[in-house]
């Protein structure tokens, strides 16, 4: 009829995409080798804990003090933490992230956590050294050079102090957080950290709700951040722990 003529001939049925079986994917040697490298970590089940509402720095744009968590009642009882970690372990938690506000201020609680669940990491500003007996990975936040740290984090010579505290410590990974203002400082900071044989990874500042300060990224700064990340990976391949897939 006339309507059918206007529509034209019906398109041929397109074949359905093939549904691959996992075993078929693993039959490819390269895929199988990559699978075997990562499957050993499948037992990890992570949970994050804020250790204290105290901090020895006051950083612009801090996620902890921009939100309601700062008003939570602090529990500094080691036995209470021991019981909590045992309950967490019984429900399958195998990896802990110890954060907020500054966990290095409660060293006795870090000891307790490590004694119950020995896999994990601590997010710290690096101002105080954490006892080597606590064998967690240590993630040390870096927001720029010492001048920027003085302005943004109200701390003098913070990068120098961080390096002094953790130089040669195999637990330590310095986390350079890119903000809109510190992108061009990354080269200077990376050179200092690499010269001290410190390992580094990258982070991108994520503004807390309601924050409109100068650290907040825009589209242009995010593009430049990616460029600098790739430059630093190329310049310091032995010291940067990062993947181009994440840049």
Language model region names:
Residues 1-5, 90, 136, 141-247:
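Radical SAM enzyme [4Fe-4S]-AdoMet core and its adjacent flexible, acidic
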Residues 5-132:
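Conserved alpha-helical substructure of the radical SAM core
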């Amino acid at each position: 009829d006339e309507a059918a003529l206007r529509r034209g001939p019906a398109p041929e049925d397109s074949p359905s995409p093939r549904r691959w079986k996992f075993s078929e994917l693993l039959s490819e040697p390269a895929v199988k080798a990559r699978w075997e490298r990562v499957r050993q970590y499948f037992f990890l089940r992570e949970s994050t804990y804020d250790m204290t509402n105290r901090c020895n720095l006051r950083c612009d744009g801090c996620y902890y003090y921009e939100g309601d968590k700062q008003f939570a009642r602090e529990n500094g009882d080691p036995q209470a933490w021991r019981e909590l970690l045992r309950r967490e372990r019984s429900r399958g938690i195998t990896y802990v992230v110890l954060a907020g506000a500054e966990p290095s201020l409660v060293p006795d609680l870090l000891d307790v956590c490590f004694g119950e669940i020995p896999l994990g990491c601590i997010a710290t500003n690096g101002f105080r050294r954490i006892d080597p007996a606590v064998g967690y990975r240590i993630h040390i936040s870096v927001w720029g050079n010492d001048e920027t740290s003085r302005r943004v984090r109200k701390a003098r010579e913070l990068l120098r102090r961080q390096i002094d505290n953790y130089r040669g410590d195999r637990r330590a990974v310095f986390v350079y957080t890119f903000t809109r203002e510190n992108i061009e400082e990354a080269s200077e900071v990376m050179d200092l950290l690499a010269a001290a044989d410190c390992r580094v990874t990258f982070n991108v500042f994520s503004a807390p709700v309601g924050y409109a300060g100068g650290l907040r990224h825009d589209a242009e700064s995010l593009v430049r951040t990616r460029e600098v990340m790739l430059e630093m990976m190329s310049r310091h391949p032995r010291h940067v722990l990062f993947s181009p897939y994440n840049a």
